[in-house]
């Protein structure tokens, strides 16, 4: 989830959003497949060199000159004009009728943007409790990109969840 917001943040958020629309973002290119892998590992030191190369082949493509370009939409870098209204989100979550698998990473960095660990842990637990049928799991030795860090462990959790 995202950090709570307050209405007083709206004017600056709209200004930031409009500024970012005026100056559209772009995706950086890289000189080689190995440079893409290095960039992935810079963001995620748990990523093995082999897995980083594998992901590079799926995350970026080379052009005719040999430069590698990330296959992402640069617009995802633009801040949302709308504030994250936690209570509205939770009202929606209360209406979920399907079972939910909530997976967390042992080395998450959610504390960096949501606040002190003890407070955030309590807030995450509060949010999770509104989901009528939720099963939680923790993946060891994984961070924010847990699907990159421990894909086999995540796949096992999902498979077990789906057959229950």
Please give the residue ranges for each predicted region.
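Hydrophobic "lid"/C-terminal helical patch
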Residues: 154, 158, 162
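Nucleotide-sugar-dependent glycosyltransferase donor-binding/catalytic pocket residues
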Residues: 4, 109, 144-147
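Catalytic histidine-centered segment of alpha/beta-hydrolase-like enzymes
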Residues: 136-151, 155
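Conserved loop-alpha-helix segment in the C-terminal half of the alpha/beta-hydrolase fold
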Residues: 94-142
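Alpha/beta-hydrolase
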Residues: 28-115
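Flexible "cap/lid" loop of the alpha/beta hydrolase fold
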Residues: 1-33
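Short, glycine/charged-enriched secondary-structure capping and boundary segments
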Residues: 9-14, 115-119, 151-154
